[in-house]
């Protein structure tokens, strides 16, 4: 499990977080994919420049 902290530009760059099974970067490292997020089991894509921190939990 990972918790990803990121800046949300839609909320004035407020730091938010999501929890997923795992996260990996795109091949060109411009996007971070967070897999199996929370209960929904969906994939969230975040621009890599907005990622603040990734923690293993």
Predicted regions located by residue number:
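A short beta-strand micro-motif
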Residues: 1-11
């Amino acid at each position: 499990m990972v918790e990803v902290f990121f800046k949300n530009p839609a909320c004035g760059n407020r730091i938010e977080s999501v929890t997923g099974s795992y996260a990996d970067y795109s091949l060109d490292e411009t996007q971070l994919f967070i897999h199996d997020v929370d209960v929904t089991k969906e994939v969230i894509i975040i621009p890599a420049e907005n990622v603040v921190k990734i923690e293993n939990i």
